[in-house]
Amino acid sequence: MTAQILDGKATAAAIKSELTARVAALKERGVTPGLGTVLVGDDPGSQKYVAGKHRDCAQVGIASIQRELPATATQEEIEAVVRELNEDPACTGYIVQLPLPRGIDENRILELMDPDKDADGLHPMNLGRLVLNEPAPLPCTPNGILTLLRRYGVEIKGAEVVVVGRGVTIGRPMPLLLTRRSENATVTQCHTGTRDLAAHLKRADIVIAAAGSPHLVRPEDVKPGAAVLDVGVSRNAEGKIMGDVHPGVAEVAAWISPNPGGVGPMTRAQLLVNVVEAAERSAG
């Protein structure tokens, strides 16, 4: 068996096409969605990531609002930019690119953001709304994973899902999304400290690997016919980017998301979805 590819690039392109029509409809009503980004410092990886977000915006007609500060920016200077975007009616959603320079209180910065403009879906208030099953911007990567599974017809209802990872961006919120009544999956949350991880993986219909541990998920640990999504990012001794899933898993699983090219494009697409949905809510 060779797994079918869960193609995040193609699915993200389809989502962007749908968003283009929704943005055009908003503009006819006099509303232009705007994505703001706050970039502090000159880290090449962060610069590349933010530039990609603004290219995505241009493709669907979302306005770009870019705020860049030097690495020497103070806590007060960054907070001032956050307050400015909170008040700017042209900005319907924004992100603060992490990590911030050493000495900056990231949590304080994130808490200052207007929850309704939280394009990443990771504001403490919005994570709380997710726990309470109340409407709110959803975390981009977990929601992107769900969208990818749905678009390929992978059965989620009643599925046994193992989430490997416990980070705030994926591992923590992913089970909250999967156990909503609209999904009705049964979730086991594991991590690098889990005893006998293989025993859990072998029972899983869907594996979401987001631990940042190279090739943690091995072919012999995967149930034949499972769907396996590789969201982990780490580097080996030579500096090469590695995923959490061993390449041999593709010979056992029925579905697999490549890394890169699987979940990454979906994360960026869901960021745009959050911005457009915020604009639609404000338009009434």
From Swiss-Prot:
It comes from the Bacteria. GO terms for cellular component: cytosol. SUPFAM superfamilies: Aminoacid dehydrogenase-like, N-terminal domain, NAD(P)-binding Rossmann-fold domains. The keyword Oxidoreductase applies. InterPro entries: Aminoacid_DH-like_N_sf, NAD(P)-bd_dom_sf, THF_DH/CycHdrlase, THF_DH/CycHdrlase_cat_dom, THF_DH/CycHdrlase_NAD-bd_dom. GO terms for biological process: L-histidine biosynthetic process; methionine biosynthetic process; purine nucleotide biosynthetic process; tetrahydrofolate interconversion. Pathway: One-carbon metabolism; tetrahydrofolate interconversion. The keyword Hydrolase applies. NADP(+) binds at residues 165-167, 192, 233. It catalyses: (6R)-5,10-methylene-5,6,7,8-tetrahydrofolate + NADP(+) = (6R)-5,10-methenyltetrahydrofolate + NADPH; (6R)-5,10-methenyltetrahydrofolate + H2O = (6R)-10-formyltetrahydrofolate + H(+). Pfam families: THF_DHG_CYH (PF00763), THF_DHG_CYH_C (PF02882). Its EC number is 1.5.1.5, 3.5.4.9. One of its GO terms (molecular function) is methylenetetrahydrofolate dehydrogenase (NADP+) activity. Keywords: Amino-acid biosynthesis, Histidine biosynthesis, Hydrolase, Methionine biosynthesis, Multifunctional enzyme, NADP, One-carbon metabolism, Oxidoreductase, Purine biosynthesis. Belongs to the tetrahydrofolate dehydrogenase/cyclohydrolase family. Homodimer. NCBIfam families: PRK14193.1. Catalyzes the oxidation of 5,10-methylenetetrahydrofolate to 5,10-methenyltetrahydrofolate and then the hydrolysis of 5,10-methenyltetrahydrofolate to 10-formyltetrahydrofolate. This is Bifunctional protein FolD. It comes from Streptomyces coelicolor (strain ATCC BAA-471 / A3(2) / M145). The gene is folD.
